[in-house]
Amino acid sequence: MDTAVVYADLHLARTGEPKHKSPPSLSPDTCQCPRWHRLALKLGCACLILLVLSVIGLGVLVLTLLQKPLIQNSPADVQENRTKTTDSPTKLKCPKDWHSHQDKCFHVSQAPNTWNKSLADCGGKGATLLLIQDQEELRFLRNLTKGKDRSFWIGLNYTLPDKNWKWINSSTLNSDVLSIFGDTKQNSCASISQDKVLSESCDSDNLWICQKELKCECMCNGS
């Protein structure tokens, strides 16, 4: 009798103990990914980020290169460019005692002489007797010689058998540019005064005007 009671008490005590909860079972439709799948996904994301950063960096590099010269100059090329820049013409300049106007230099003689000797003097200076281009140039020359009460030989004479006024460069006088006053005959040469272009004997003594083209004056190394 006592033994039965003890057995019953032990049975009740065991059945009253709390039961451990088991984890909920997954439904058959749920897919549980293995751990290496998750690791592969993380690595893929990291690679994608690195790829995007690489593309951005490459784009910046390309833009930087495009802003630079395609070919870098060698030291020899740099020196050559400096030499060209230094030796480049800086201005147009006439010789001393010559006067510049437009693209010409003019020289006025100080002592009178015949037309032929005046022509030879200009040739010795590497120039020619004056060849008047237009009325504007004639006005400049009259201002240049203003105050000198003399006429000035120019490179124009009367030629036979053509019976024409010709410049020493063989071109014929344009009467719209100059009108000649005075007798026109053999051995006639032209001179300019403050108000006229005169026909005179080539053996007369006059001052004269030489002309030459402007030349480039270069500023070179060591000058």
From Swiss-Prot:
Tissue expression as described in the entry: Expressed in a subset of natural killer cells.
GO cellular component terms given for this protein: cell surface; external side of plasma membrane; plasma membrane
Family annotation (SMART domains): CLECT
Extracellular face of the membrane: 67-223
Membrane topology: Single-pass type II membrane protein
InterPro entries referenced in this protein's UniProt entry, alphabetically: C-type_lectin-like, C-type_lectin-like/link_sf, CTDL_fold, KLR_subfamily_B, NKR-like_CTLD
SS bond list: C122-C210, C189-C202
Protein's cellular compartments: Membrane
Short motif ITIM motif, span: 5-10
GO biological process, one term: positive regulation of natural killer cell mediated cytotoxicity
Highest taxon, organism lineage: Eukaryota
Transmembrane segment boundaries: 46-66
Molecular functions (GO terms): carbohydrate binding; identical protein binding; protein homodimerization activity; signaling receptor activity
Stretches assigned to the Cytoplasmic side: 1-45
PROSITE patterns: C_TYPE_LECTIN_2 (PS50041)
The C-type lectin domain, residue ranges: 101-211
Motif (LCK-binding motif) on chain: 31-34
Gene3D superfamilies hit by this protein: Mannose-Binding Protein A, subunit A (3.10.100.10)
Keywords from the UniProt entry: Disulfide bond, Lectin, Membrane, Receptor, Signal-anchor, Transmembrane, Transmembrane helix
Complex formation: Homodimer; disulfide-linked. Interacts with tyrosine kinase LCK. Binds PTPN6/SHP-1 in a phosphorylation-dependent manner.
Function: Receptor for CLEC2D/OCIL. Ligand-binding contributes to inhibition of cytotoxic natural killer (NK) cells. May mediate MHC class I-independent 'missing-self' recognition of allografts, tumor cells and virus-infected cells.
Domain text: Contains 1 copy of a cytoplasmic motif that is referred to as the immunoreceptor tyrosine-based inhibitor motif (ITIM). The phosphorylated ITIM motif can bind the SH2 domain of several SH2-containing phosphatases leading to down-regulation of cell activation.
Protein name from the UniProt record: Killer cell lectin-like receptor subfamily B member 1B allele B
Annotated source species: Rattus norvegicus
Gene this chain is encoded by: Klrb1b
